Each structure stands twice: as structure tokens, then as C-alpha cells.
Amino acid sequence: MFPSGLQAGIINTTKVYRDCSQLPSNSPSGLYIIQPKDTHPLMVYCEMNTTGGGWTVIQRNRGSGELTWDESWTTYKYGFGDILQDHWLGMEYIHKIASQTIYEIRFVIYDASNNMKYADYNMFLVDNEKNGYKLRLGSYFGTAGDGMTVPEANKLHDNRKFSTKDKDQDNTSGNCASGYGGWWYDACFASNLNVKSGLTWHNLCTKCMGSIILIRPSSICRGA
């Protein structure tokens, strides 16, 4: 079941952290102010209860919320939405956070029956804006199936640049983002979670109920 009743109000800390993984292990989930290297303080939602905690939430989409996800490059760059509800943290901030060390990413998908599945990739990197915020992923593990590194023609998201309706960087003559929202498109997709309805995760569901995307330093670095 998609989570509701999230902790509101910023949780004050005595230190400034680079990301949610630096919070004390007994910290509750909720809103925190972090300051990644080379950028300003940033409000994020820290998920501290999922698989060891320390996750920084970069996307939440209930599928039926108010956001259309049909936004410009600049809006996707700096983020939009309500951190406690549907939102996109912002490509520039995602890039800054994930450039601090080796990160991993978890895609949480609520399927058509609202059952939670997940797809983990043990390495996650987003290049800078000059390089199109290109996505780099490691090895897959999970219950949702591999929806991002599938070796199928026109459906590979790994090593693809980010596209929006006003900045087309995909591998087709048209613009995938003009109909489906900002994402790392090939021509066009196996999975897409940045859309108002019709969230898709490869073979799992084409009408997924919702999604959450979380990142934290990789277990490769943590020694887990």
C-alpha cells in the first residue's frame, strides 16, 4: 500500500549532513535540511525505516496526484512538487548528492494491485548538466524486475541522457518527453515513473499505482 500520513515539519539537527545516510541510525523518517557538497542547504525527505535506512527520497509519484509531470527542463533541473507528497527533487541536486561518493538507487513501484515491489541498482550516478544528466547504473537486484538496464532495442535507460518536452536528448526522431514527462529515454522506454497516469515498469505493470525513488551511499562503500 502506498504510504500516507508522512511526518510533517522539519526535524532539527545539531549538525549539517551531506545526505540522509549521515543521520544517526535511530533518527525518525521525515523532513530534514541537508547540504550536499558544492550546493546550498536543501530540504529533503529522509526514509529511515526501509532496509537499513539512510535513504534520500528524490521522487514520489502517487499517479493520481495533482502534478502532471509535464514540466520544462529548468523545472526538472531545480525540482517541483511537495516533498511530503508528489515531487521531483531536481536533476541538479540529484547530481550534486550522487557525486559525493558511490551511490545506490532503489526504485519502489506499487503495481496495478498496489503491491510494493522494488528494483535496486548497486551503483548510481547522474552526470552534470553539460553531459545531459546522463544516467549510469550498476547491477540489478530486487522483486520488480530489471526495468532500467534491460538489453532490449529502444528500451535501455542506462547510459541515456535526461529529456524534457523542451530539451530532446533521446534516441528517436520524435520527443518521448513531449508525451510522457521528463525521463532518461531511449526511443522510448521500458519504464517511466515520471508521468501522471500510466506509470510503467517494464514487465511488472503499465498502470502502476505509484512510485518512490530513493538513493544512498552504496553498500560497496558501506562495506555491507
Functional labels for PLM-detected ranges:
Residues 14, 196-224:
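C-terminal helix/juxtamembrane-tail motif
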